Amino acid sequence: MESDSEMVPFPQLPMPIENNYRACTIPYRFPSDDPKKATPNEISWINVFANSIPSFKKRAESDITVPDAPARAEKFAERYAGILEDLKKDPESHGGPPDGILLCRLREQVLRELGFRDIFKKVKDEENAKAISLFPQVVSLSDAIEDDGKRLENLVRGIFAGNIFDLGSAQLAEVFSRDGMSFLASCQNLVPRPWVIDDLENFQAKWINKSWKKAVIFVDNSGADIILGILPFARELLRRGAQVVLAANELPSINDITCTELTEILSQLKDENGQLLGVDTSKLLIANSGNDLPVIDLSRVSQELAYLSSDADLVIVEGMGRGIETNLYAQFKCDSLKIGMVKHLEVAEFLGGRLYDCVFKFNEVQS
């Protein structure tokens, strides 16, 4: 289901890719494991995906763009649950052994085969509209902070607070359907520092020197995440003279923002002079990443993104799927930042942190 045009490796990955890059962070199995027997880790993660089936089924049932949505949603739940059971019995079935990317891909495949293209569209539209109305307030609160380092920390907290809006997490989907998400309250209620990975001071030191000329940001969710988290941060980078490329999914997957949706949101936020609350956006570009999942394998990105990223000196991978469950340990030829909130207990345990802990992993490349 990826982009029809040929996919290429992300140019900031060191070559050869096969020796230097592995997308998935958490190993579900080791070479010594029996290939015919599911490992405890595989079973645990298959169960994480199984637990999300009811919330996906519920979204699919109410998709008004699909005829017979309730019956098809039931079929989705049965088919995907069947695939997960098959993988427990034989980890080599369905293109296995399973990892986070395969389990996501199989779920999307079943949804799309049944005609479900974008089951989270309604909630994405609602959350985008809410976040757009809050954008000026969030930016003016940030702009009022005079100290560069403190303003950066405030913007980073905004990214974490926005990143809570993740309907791929079964637990958060339940919280969300019960009482929604309050962005400003979330900013105040982050787990206290130090976070499970906390390189904020090192990043701040480099930030204050205005050292980056071009940043590529792999974005994550719709709503507060992109609009109140990433865009104020990107606007600050623009204000400091950097060029910014926002890399978004080509096709819908859970409540992640797509390239088309992001273009539309930016056109609503910009004024008649093309400014984002007083900041020129001529150096802000939106790129189609070529991806269609909530995780990302950077050995396969669109040619458009590869072309725009070849001279980047900062790569930011945001969100639990792209920046923690995949790519946390990815090395790049330039400086990199992985930033996201831990929203699965299994990830928290792997990292030795707490649920809803924050990851801020900065790697500086010595020139």
From Swiss-Prot:
Family as reported in the entry's similarity comment: Belongs to the damage-control phosphatase family. Phosphopantetheine phosphatase II subfamily.
Pfam families: ARMT1-like_dom
Name this protein carries in UniProt: Damage-control phosphatase At2g17340
Binding-site positions, Mn(2+): 220-221, 256
UniProt keyword Metal-binding, yes or no: yes
Subunit structure: Multimer.
Regulation of this protein's activity per its record: Activity is strongly promoted by Co(2+), Ni(2+), Mg(2+), Cu(2+) and Mn(2+). Activity is inhibited by EDTA.
EC number annotated for this UniProt entry: 3.1.3.-
InterPro entries the record matches: ARMT-1-like_metal-bd_sf (IPR036075), ARMT1-like_metal-bd (IPR002791), At2g17340 (IPR016949), At2g17340_3_helix_bundle (IPR035073), Type_II_PanK (IPR004567)
UniProt motif Subfamily II EGMGR motif: location: 318-322
Gene Ontology molecular functions: ATP binding; hydrolase activity; metal ion binding
Domain of life of the source: Eukaryota
Comment on protein domains: Subfamily II proteins have an EGMGR motif about 50 residues from the C-terminus. This motif lies near the metal-binding residues in the putative substrate-binding cleft 2. Subfamily II proteins occur only in eukaryotes, in two forms: as a stand-alone unit in plants, and as a C-terminal domain of pantothenate kinases in plants, animals, and chytrid fungi.
Residues bearing PTM N-acetylmethionine: 1
Cofactor: binding details: Phosphatase activity is strongly promoted by several divalent cations but it is suggested that Mn(2+) and possibly Ni(2+) represent biologically relevant metal ion cofactors for damage-control phosphatases.
Species: Arabidopsis thaliana
UniProt key word Ligase: no
Cellular component terms per the entry's GO annotation: cytosol; mitochondrion
Cofactor: Mn(2+); Ni(2+)
Known role: Metal-dependent phosphatase with probable damage-control functions. Shows phosphatase activity against several substrates, including sugar phosphates and p-nitrophenyl phosphate(pNPP). Prefers sugar phosphate substrates, including the extremely potent glycating agents ribose-5-phosphate and erythrose-4-phosphate.
Gene Ontology biological process terms from the UniProt entry: coenzyme A biosynthetic process
Alphabetical keyword list: Acetylation, Hydrolase, Manganese, Metal-binding, Nickel
